[in-house]
Every structure is written in C-alpha cells, then in structure tokens.
C-alpha cells in the first residue's frame, strides 16, 4: 500500500454531518462534512480530525465546531492505493495490478473565519 502526503489549506462552510468515534486504544476521530464554493458550485469533502499526544483536536472539533460556521482547515491529502478482494490477481490492459485509489483529507488545525466586507477579505475570529 502506497501513501502520498501533501499539505492543503481550505476555507469553507461546515455541513450537517459530524461523527465522533472512539477507539478501544483510547484514540478518537471526528469527521465533518465541509463545503468549499468555487464560483456557483459547491464541492463537499469529509475531513478527519484525530486526537494526538499534544492536542485533543478531535474532541475540540466535536465539541466546538457547528453546522453553518465558516472555518479554515489546514491538513494533508492522503492517498491510499489498495487492491480489494474482487480485483486480486487481475491486471489492467498494460499488465499492471488493478488497484483503487482513495483520497482523504486529515485536518491538523482549524480556525473560525468571517468575511469583512469593508476590507473585502477573510479574517480570523478569536
């Protein structure tokens, strides 16, 4: 399995979906739906936030981030390539093993923002 990691910064609106999961190991992940508008079109993403040794980000997002808020997310794009059972042993037209690629966004920070019409720019909310 290959993993490709990049850095991204997205500004958008928090959607309705939010799910918090706790693991037997004591870890936690919070997943939110996040909408980014490009022109007249909205693109939706699912962003995962995890608790770490230095910051309980999943707990913070689960408790404090609300539907409809504008936030800026900093995170990483993580691409997982894997071969599901139904494709095991199969190859494409070039003889390469068939795989599926799945891209996820893992957030490592967020900040609330608002649009200042007077200055015509986004600003952070404390």
Residue positions per predicted region:
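Single-stranded nucleic acid-binding surfaces, predominantly the OB-fold ssDNA-binding core
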Residues: 1-126
């Amino acid at each position: 399995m290959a993993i490709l990691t990049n850095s991204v910064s997205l500004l958008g609106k928090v959607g309705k979906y939010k799910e918090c999961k706790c693991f037997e190991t004591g870890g936690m992940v919070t997943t939110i739906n996040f909408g980014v508008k490009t022109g007249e079109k909205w693109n939706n993403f699912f962003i995962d936030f995890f608790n770490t040794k230095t910051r309980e980000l999943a707990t913070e997002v689960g408790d404090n981030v609300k539907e409809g808020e504008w936030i800026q997310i900093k995170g990483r794009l993580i691409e997982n390539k894997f071969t599901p059972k139904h494709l095991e042993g199969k190859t494409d037209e070039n003889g390469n093993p068939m795989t599926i690629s799945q891209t996820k966004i893992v957030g490592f920070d967020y900040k609330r923002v608002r649009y200042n019409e007077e200055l015509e720019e986004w600003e952070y909310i404390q």
